[in-house]
Amino acid sequence: MAAGVMLAATIAVLPASAAAQPGPSAGRPDRAELRAALTAVPEAGVPGVLAEVRQGRHDWRAAAGQAYLTKPRPMQPQMRHRIGSITKTFVATAVLQLVDEGRLGLDDPVGKWLPDTVPGERGDQVTVRMLLNHTSGIGNYTNAMIDSYAAINQMQVTTYAPADLVATGLAMPPTGAPGATFSYSNTNYVLAGLLIEAVTGNDAPAEVQRRILRPLKLTGTSFPGTDPTIRGPHSGAYFAPFGARDLSEFNMSWGWTAGEMISTTADLNTFFRALLDGDLLSPATLKQMLDGVPMLPELPEAGTYGLGIYSLPTPCGEFWGHDGAVFGHLTYSLHSRDGTRQVSSGINISHYQVGLPDPHPFDIAWQTFLLTAMCPTSDVSSRSAETAPQLPSVTRMPGNDAAVAAP
């Protein structure tokens, strides 16, 4: 959920010796190893980082660095964080519960439910499944909205109606024929929210609350709506393409069901574990959720995007999850399919550059920590930051890269 470019296209191809190693056991996390990798993130330039790692029945929560640049307050692991596009996994799960209930079909044309919003041939051709796996061919409205600091200033204080966000995306040139190819678009998930409302007659965020947040007791997770603040303990949110600026107060209605949510690392791990354990969806529907399309067809090792969730090959097996990027907060939440390894982590700074930039040292340090958490027994954890593989960010991919002009 961001105006930016990809952090890195793929995880690097590793030597055969690394790939051949057995996956890590579900034993107790190596706290010293994790602490060293986490501490390296603020040392590389991030104000603060927080994380929760779960291995089997053992949890490790920690933070490093500063919550604010303007006052000496350390980052705390329980702080709430804007999770951006990880919102999509919650929303997709709610849509798929409607599928399980027989109230909606994945291959229903969107125009069946939203005839006035997506009229005509496009409404007949684009299906619910295409929205959820980003193969609809509908443009990404955020690319049209964000082109300068002035635009960001306006977004920060503006309340957007979901229908207006969708209209912006539909007015953009198609990114491809419906169903033809993956092209990440926030418009798809605003439409998914409108679908929830059309089917249930209820507010989409309220349906996510009722179906997912309340049953799982995710008390640190919410849709803030038009409230620009983050309720409860939180850090600053520093947007830094041209110098750090705190954007922790932001009207997130521009993200709505594509990227509005706030959560904690503990809540994210609880949610994804319940999802992948089959507690939220039927086995058949969960299987469809995980059946993905290539994110970069020319690079199969980049992983696949399912229905609101993506797969990521690593040296110790496949992980599932999502990342999120909004102004000032970046988040990853990644999980092994069997539930023995989970990591959710966030940093309180974001930067976007035109084109395909070389990774910043703090990008590399953070990804090194994430890989250490996922693969503690592989040789990834012993690599230097300069040679560590890089994780993809679907929220910052080519074609999802509105450029921010200098102020």
PLM region spans:
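Secretory targeting and sorting signals
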Residues: 1-22
